[in-house]
Structures are given as C-alpha cells and as structure tokens.
Amino acid sequence: MKENVASRAVFILLLFLNASLLNGQSPPGKPKIIKCRSPGKETFTCWWEPGSDGGLPTNYTLTYHKEGETLIHECPDYKTGGPNTCYFSKKHTSIWKIYVITVNAINQMGVSSSDPLYVDVTYIVEPEPPANLTLELKHPEDRKPYLWIKWFPPTLTDVKSGWFMIQYEIRLKPETAADWEIHFAAKQTQLKIFSLYPGQKYLVQVRCKPDHGYWSEWSPESSIQIPNDFPVNDTTVWIFVAVLSAVICLIMVWAVALKGYSMMTCILPPVPGPKIKGFDIHLLEKGKSEELLRALESQDFPPTSDCEDLLMEFIEVDDSEDQQLMPRPSKEHMEQGVKPMHMDPDSDSGRGSCDSPSLFSEKCDEPQAHPFKFYTPEDPEKLENPETNLTCLQAPQSTSREDKIPYFHANGPKSSTWPFPQPPSLHNPRYSYHNIADVCELALGMAGTTATLLDQTDQHALKPSKTIETGGEGKAAKQRESEGCSSKPDQDTGWPLPQDKTPLISAKPLEYVEIHKVSQDGVLALFPKQNEKVGAPETSKEYSKVSRVTDSNILVLVPDTQVQNLTLLEEPAKEAPPALP
C-alpha cells in the first residue's frame, strides 16, 4: 500500500510541472550591472540590465555592502536615476571605500543574482558634458581672423572648490565632412581655431574628463557659418620650403657620411699644438742627435753668451833673449840657413785672454793720425834715460793705416807688443799676431842664431836707413821716414843691425814672470828677472810706462823713472787694471 501512495504523488507532481512548462513560466534570468558613475565624487548612480522574467512578474533589488563589513544594505533610491537604476545620495556615499554591489531578480519560479561589482567612487567619476557652448568669429586688426569657442564647466561638478581638476577636448568638422578634427584644450574653457575653409558650415562639440575618471558625453552640437571672404593661410609655400629643407638636410647628411673628417677639418680646423721653432719631433724619436742639432743650428737665432763683457784677468809680456824686436825673416833669409825659433807660451799664463778679438776694439777703430817711430841711438849711454831715446816723427797726413810701420829702438828698453785683431778686408798682407810669443818672434827675430849671424856679418854692409818692411811697403816707408826725420839727421832713421857700441842682444836672458805692481793711476809694472847671475848683479828695470799702441796693434812699454823710485813692498792690486787709455 505504501509503495502505491508514493508513486501516485510523484505522478501528480510531474503533471503539474508539465502544465507549467506548457504555459511558458520559468525562473527569472541573470541580471547584469552596466556601470556606476559619479558626477562629482559626492553622489553616484548604478545602472543594470535585467534578464528574462520567466513569464512571471519579476522583482529586482540592488544590495550592497562595504568591504570589511558583513551588514548588507539595499539601494536607497530606485527612482531618481530612472528605471533599473540605483541612486546613492551624499548620505550613502563614502570616498576611499569599496562597495560590493549585486542585483537580484525574484519571481514565483525562483531567484537569480548578477555578478558582484566592486566600485570605488574616486575612480568612477564621469562628469556631465560642458554647458553653454558658444561659437564666434573674431576679426582682429593686427592679427588673422579666427574662430573663438567658449564653454562652461559641468553644473554638477564643483570645480571652484578644487575638489578635482577637469580637462577639456573639442572636436569640429565641416558639415559635409565625415571625420572630426580634435583639439585638446587642457584646463582652459576657451579655444581659438585658425585656418578654416571659407563658405563652410562647421559643427562643434566639447567634452570633459576629471583627473581620475572617464570622459563625459559630448555636448550637443553647435554650428557656425564661415563667410566666403574669410582669409585662409596658403600652405603651399610652407610645404615647398619644408620639402626643400628636407632635401638639403639629406644632402648634408650624405656628404658628412662620405667625407665627414675632411668637412669637420674644414669647418673646425684643429688647433695646432705648441711647437718649438726648428725642433723636429720625428728626429727626436729616431734618436739621431746629429741631425737634431744640425736642424737647431740652422735657425736664425742670434748667438748667446753668458758673459756680456770679456774681461782680461792676466797680462803677461815676454822679453826673452831668444826673441828680439825685428821682423820675421823672409824666405830670402830662410835660404841662408836661418830658422826662426818658436817659443811656446805657457798655457797657464792667462795669455789666451789676450787673443780676444773684441779686446781694445775701440782703440783699433780710432784713427792714428800721428804714428810714432823709434830709433836706436848711437850712444849707449843714453840707455839711462829711455824717454830721450825715443824720437817721434809725424808721418804725412795722407798716409793710411796700412802705410804706417812701427820702428823700434835697438838699445832702448825691451818692449812688448799687444795683439790686435786685423780686419780681413785689408788688401796688403800683414803678419797676424795671436799671442805675445809671435809678436816677440816677429819683432826680435831669432835669438841665438841671429846674434851669431850678426857677429859674422859685415856691419858696414848694412845700410843705416834699412827698416822693417811689412806687407811689401818698405820702400814707401823708407821715403816717408827720411822725410819725417829731417829734424835729427845725425841719428839712424831705421833699424840697423847690431853695432859695436850697442849690442843687439843682452848677454843674460830676461824673463817677465809676474806683474810687479799696479800703481794707483792704473799703471802696469812688470818685474824682469834674470835666470842666471854672472859677475856683478845687474840693476833691474821696471817697464811700467806704456809709450803707445802702434798701428799694427803693438803695445810698447818703456821704463818709468818715477815708478822705479816707489817702494817694491807695495801690495799689488787685487782687481784687474782698468782699460788702457
């Protein structure tokens, strides 16, 4: 019995179900939330799309709860936003809160719910379109005409309080065109449009968007008619200029790519580094010092010297028995077997300083108008007063420096010569004096050999008027001497060979080895010393008086009687004597 009752109940239920299906009734379909939008972060509205009702009346409800809460709330206002909407007023709107929103559909056949939607009011802001869009053509005098577009912010958006910032976007097009021309206006509420086509009617719209949110809907269209006389910028010229500039740039890039280094060198030449004139770096790298020095010497640099003034520290005058005041024997005397003896000067005597070509250059440049000539007196007793033994005759004024020949007294005090530089431009040859030994050799001749030869030579065979010939000018000098010495015809006018009364050479050699003293007047005193003493000691004489400097640059010293009377114990001068006058 029990099994029959159960089967009957199931059968009845199936009959009822089949009857409802045959009538088209079913549970409601699943609804869908479209979006939620807030016009100004103070209120917001949500829209949904309902599903099928199942042939039965269906009731839709919106429920929500805030994140972190368990209490579920129903929509506070279903009417303000319109059908299938829910409006949240300021009382029910909270910022920085996330809402979990769900839409439920209920009928007699069942219940269905939509997928939940998570909403943050800050990021669902979609303002209303801007209001009061205005279009106006402007014709300024100093500028080109333009279309001036002006609008106002949305009415429901609190822009003045700074609650949020709104950006604007404008689009316009000719009425017959299909595409819109969009201009971004940022935060400003006006915009100027140039380059409009004349005779066209333009349509303009504007919209806005907050800093966080969505673009608003476009505002209603506004239109304006552009007159036919509206000036338009001719862009053809600018297009031509742009194309030409692009071609020039391409050519320059191509040239730089091919010849970049040469062009850069031409435009920006390299700055030369510091370089010493005549200094070759390649020669220095090769290590060829000879070529480097030769390159440096070839430059036109003036020679430099550490010493501006050449000073003479030592003066040494030799008066030796082997050297007498007579000219160097010529080739004719050499054929007779007479050879001159050369006396090597002491390398430590400081005599090399006398060879300076710049020494006494001023003296050499001054013309000697009255050359002196010295003669040998016949009376040997006149040796006591050497100053009286010197006879000076003036040569004619027309006589040049080359014609002036010095003559020396044979029995007078032994003299020394001073070497002067001879100018190389002289045509007539002269002897070149480079040291005291050569002067003495030229002046005195040969020492011992000459004395022996003179003893064997007939004294009367030599002429008293024979003089020393220099540079082939002996005859002219003889004639001038004979004319100038007319005041003293009794004395010999030349250099005679040794006579009986006056021996030519001293028996004992004299050698000047030191400077005796220098007087307060700057007079140089030389002290003669004998190497050997035979018999009674001879009285030494001091040759301290400079008689003169001859044209041949020979310094002549004679005894000074006043200097001889001074004491020999006077301390010699420590400094070099001043230049001789």
UniProtKB/Swiss-Prot annotation:
MF terms in GO: cytokine binding; metal ion binding; peptide hormone binding; prolactin receptor activity
Compartments reported by the entry: Membrane
Extracellular side, ranges: 25-234
Glycosylation sites: N59, N132, N233
TM region(s), chain numbering: 235-258
Residue window of motif WSXWS motif: 215-219
Its biological purpose: This is a receptor for the anterior pituitary hormone prolactin.
UniProt name for this protein: Prolactin receptor
Organism: Cervus elaphus (Red deer)
Encoding gene per record: PRLR
